[in-house]
Amino acid sequence: MFYHISLEHEILLHPRYFGPNLLNTVKQKLFTEVEGTCTGKYGFVIAVTTIDNIGAGVIQPGRGFVLYPVKYKAIVFRPFKGEVVDAVVTQVNKVGLFTEIGPMSCFISRHSIPSEMEFDPNSNPPCYKTMDEDIVIQQDDEIRLKIVGTRVDKNDIFAIGSLMDDYLGLVS
């Protein structure tokens, strides 16, 4: 799910950036350091929307670097168990499907794929399909899945998904 939340970050700036464009440099460095990153607590930082406050810089003794505390608002993506999301299939093999939900990767075990869908290793590309070939899921297809579990690391979030519910599967 997407959230718009207030966050804080500290920017460490080299003395060569001191000058008339100091604040623009701090803003630019904030965008490059936080956008696209993942924190276990808040999820993936998609975009910085506003910068609320750039605090007074604190000079680091013996180094000359300055540390600026920055308060900002950002849009973050944090998946939860039970959430239904759309994903893109990146890999299909006999153990299941590997998908991407934006910046997050998700695995769907073959035991969480409906029993009427069988893996066909002889097709090119490999796919899961029904007996009448009415539904075929292969690489680069868009599917709708339910998140049944997440694993949160320090810098990444990984999910386990399922297609065993109503209205889940291939999005046409």
Curated annotation (Swiss-Prot):
By its UniProt entry, which SMART domains does this protein fall under? S1
For this UniProt record, give its keywords in alphabetical order, as a comma-separated list: DNA-directed RNA polymerase, Nucleus, RNA-binding, Transcription
- Biological processes per GO annotation: nuclear-transcribed mRNA catabolic process; positive regulation of nuclear-transcribed mRNA poly(A) tail shortening; positive regulation of translational initiation; transcription by RNA polymerase II; transcription initiation at RNA polymerase II promoter
Q: Return the InterPro entries for the record.
A: NA-bd_OB-fold, RNA_pol_Rpb7-like_N_sf, Rpb7-like, Rpb7-like_N, S1_domain
Give one Pfam hit by family name.
SHS2_Rpb7-N
**Location(s), subcellular:** Nucleus
The reply to whether Magnesium figures as a keyword in the UniProt entry is no
Impact after mutating H111E: Strongly reduces RNA-binding
What is this protein for, i.e. what is its function?
A: Core component of RNA polymerase II (Pol II), a DNA-dependent RNA polymerase which synthesizes mRNA precursors and many functional non-coding RNAs using the four ribonucleoside triphosphates as substrates. Pol II is the central component of the basal RNA polymerase II transcription machinery. It is composed of mobile elements that move relative to each other. POLR2G/RPB7 is part of a subcomplex with POLR2D/RPB4 that binds to a pocket formed by POLR2A/RPB1, POLR2B/RPB2 and POLR2F/RPABC2 at the base of the clamp element.
The subunit field of the Swiss-Prot or TrEMBL record says:
Component of the RNA polymerase II (Pol II) core complex consisting of 12 subunits: a ten-subunit catalytic core composed of POLR2A/RPB1, POLR2B/RPB2, POLR2C/RPB3, POLR2I/RPB9, POLR2J/RPB11, POLR2E/RPABC1, POLR2F/RPABC2, POLR2H/RPABC3, POLR2K/RPABC4 and POLR2L/RPABC5 and a mobile stalk composed of two subunits POLR2D/RPB4 and POLR2G/RPB7, protruding from the core and functioning primarily in transcription initiation. Part of Pol II(G) complex, in which Pol II core associates with an additional subunit POLR2M; unlike conventional Pol II, Pol II(G) functions as a transcriptional repressor.
Instruction: Say which family it is in.
Output: Belongs to the eukaryotic RPB7/RPC8 RNA polymerase subunit family.
Could you identify this protein by its name? DNA-directed RNA polymerase II subunit RPB7
Q: Which organism is it from?
A: Homo sapiens
